[in-house]
Amino acid sequence: MASFRRRTCTTGTRFAEVGRRLAIAADHAGAALKAAIVARVAEVAPDWSVADLGGDGSDPTDDYPDSARAVAERMIAGQADRGLVICGSGIGVTIAANKFHGIRASIAHDPASARQGVVHDDMNVLAFGANLITLETALETLAAFLQSEPSSEERYLRRTAKVADIEEEQS
């Protein structure tokens, strides 16, 4: 946890002033995939700037709750429009990210699921399992996630409002 906290508690990572902002972090198991995505994200999402919030794989105590927290806190602070969290399975980071008010995280390992997660469910954080997805599929899925927008259809708005009501009731 020490190396992750050092990286995420500093103010050194800055977003570009143009376009939309993606915050990305990984635990030790997701670090290699995260680094590969960061290196190529401009290919699939040129209008998005990226803040790499840590998890470089050098410290086995870079745990999934820390990476989920880093992304969620950036989003809650209004410093990111969407988030990407990565661990070995994608499950741990999803559970941890969803503990934060206003975060709607889900695993998606294919473009159709990522697109539907945003359009139907207003998903704002995408999770990958590094042990379960290839880099090329991850990039295609990330592109679908970032290119999609929540639907303004009444049925989807009604459903996401119900989810928000549950979140408020449980706060």
Residue ranges and their predicted role:
Residues 21-22, 80-83, 102-104:
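Short active-site oxyanion
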Residues 2-4, 20-25, 29-32, 111-171:
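C-terminal binding/interaction regions
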Residues 85-131:
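Mid-chain, well-packed structural core segment of small domains
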Residues 47-60:
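A short beta-strand-loop structural module common to alpha/beta enzyme folds
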